[in-house]
UniProtKB/Swiss-Prot annotation:
One of its GO terms (cellular component) is cytoplasm. Belongs to the RNA cytidine acetyltransferase family. TmcA subfamily. InterPro entries: Acyl_CoA_acyltransferase, GNAT_dom, NAT10/TcmA_helicase, P-loop_NTPase, TmcA/NAT10/Kre33, TmcA_C_sf, TmcA_tRNA_bind, tRNA_acetyltr_TmcA. GO terms for molecular function: 18S rRNA cytidine N-acetyltransferase activity; ATP binding; tRNA binding; tRNA N4-acetyltransferase activity. Its EC number is 2.3.1.193. Pfam families: GNAT_acetyltr_2, NAT10_TcmA_helicase, tRNA_bind_3. Residues 328-481 form the N-acetyltransferase domain. The gene is tmcA. It is found in: Cytoplasm. ATP binds at Q138, G160, R161, G162, K163, S164, T165, L166, A167, G168, K169, R285. This is tRNA(Met) cytidine acetyltransferase TmcA. One of its GO terms (biological process) is rRNA acetylation involved in maturation of SSU-rRNA. Acetyl-CoA binds at I406, A407, V408, Q413, K414, Q415, G416, I417, G418, K419.
Amino acid sequence: MILAEMPPLDGGIVIHSGNISQAKQYLGQEHPYAIYDMRAEGDVWLNLDALAIIAGTIQAQGTLYLICPNWDTLEQQLDFDSQRWNGGKVIATPNFYRYFKALVQKFGFQFQTLEETDFSLPKQPPQCQATESLTPQQQKIFEKLPLDSSAIHLITAPRGRGKSTLAGKLAQQLAKTESVLITARSHSVLPSFWKSVAQHIPFFAPDHLLQKIAANQIAAKSWLFIDESASLPLPMLHQFCEYFDKVVLTTTTHNYEGTGRGFSLKFPQQLTKQYREWRLTKPLRWHENDPLEQFIDELLIMSPPSETNQYAEFYHLLAEAHYKTTPSDLRRLFDAQDQLLHSFSEHQRLVGGIWAVPEGDLEPELAEAIWRGERRPQGNLVAQYLCFQGNLLEACQLRSVRISRIAVQPELQKQGIGKRLISDFILQKIQQTRPLVDYVSVSFGLSEPLLHFWQQCGFQLVQITPTKEASSGYHSAMMLYPISAEGQRFVQQATARFERDLALQPFYAELQNMLPIRPLVQLQMDEQDWRNIEGFALAQRSLAASYVSLTRLYRQDPRNHGVLANLWQQFERIQGKKEWLENLRSLLANYLQYTR
């Protein structure tokens, strides 16, 4: 570990401060050394995702160099990475850096405090040459997997174990007698071995592959290989697994994206075909018990923390119980301002916990600008969405708390612990807060089990996103729990408006069997509809936020508003969306000028 400037050498890579996009270019590559430069405008910038990525590219006997200014005062320095996860505000992050420095000391990494003028990198040791032959562990899977009766195969391994090479060689072998396809998040992130065989084995982008499946233009009797499958939405993976006769998925445990055991737990739950998991454990890129790998694993809390630390224990619980938990969550948990933690332990073991953040209590002028579509400040996820998309201005003005995560140890789930956590959190934390919180909110990927869980906890459904989230493959649902008298009135208003609009929403036909709501089919315009249309025509409210009100206007007078027919379908098909929207706003503005 170097605390000074250093010049690059041939073959190495240099990452500057929080440049995650630069770091991602090196995924799947190998380098003799890497330099991570933490310096940023007189302070520091440490992006854990970027650090973990470049650490995973270093070959055996290679070195990671860290340029860190003012090591002794690191806890007091501003960290510009905090603006990503602290509502846009740059803060010092003392809790994380105390933890970080303790790990550096534990592993005994070398320090050198040097000036630019008197330093040169030491000579790099000769690198181990990569071998094309399979290890005994790889060879065993190579021979057994094609003969196994399971339809779905998941190959898991930490970085540097050769899972992509193994999968590539399997694909090459199978392609001699079978139809074989490859897919991944994008072609650019495929490891080099996959790219070398792509001319013989066709690659399909995931969305393109789904289109081929829908059009019945691709043979189901094929082997589909999915590289780094945890980076794709679970519903998409399940579609692939249902369609193809044989599917081989690879994914990285101890991943910089946080998709480790959580993926292995969640993925098999909805499979209808026989499934088998194969594991690679022996490192190929470096030696067993490599100190840098162990340091990164401990830094990202990939295993239960060896020493008592509230934040580390809580983060490990999240990583175990959640499909997507990232290093950014780790930084946020350690040092973000204005967050609430509530935990439940038994026999000195953390069993479950809730992570929540305050929202709302915004100035009326800012809330109005959010409603108009003119401001999008960071934070206030549910409050802003209800204000803008739900046409509920008060959502941003009232005081609320959003439950960001709830987690229970995987082996103890479905035993009522989650409901107990919610109840205790509201009774012990929320209802004791002064000034009193008006409501508690939660947002989650909409599925029947989760909807049922939150309803049993007393939450009421008030909003569903019109489109599915790319990261999860689900529509997002938002539910509220009233606390104050003002909150009671607001939640009743939000629920009534949601039920009034539901049958006209573009997603209703898809979700109606899941929703335990009998919608109120009301086509008559009210004042909120007119205000919504004015916000669309005269301000910057979106088509999605105004869609139901525009549909009511069309239904009220279809002869004079033919342009509003099938709005959602028009918008999805149209090429010049921006110009089309501006024309629609102009037409409605003229209409309002003569009718309102």
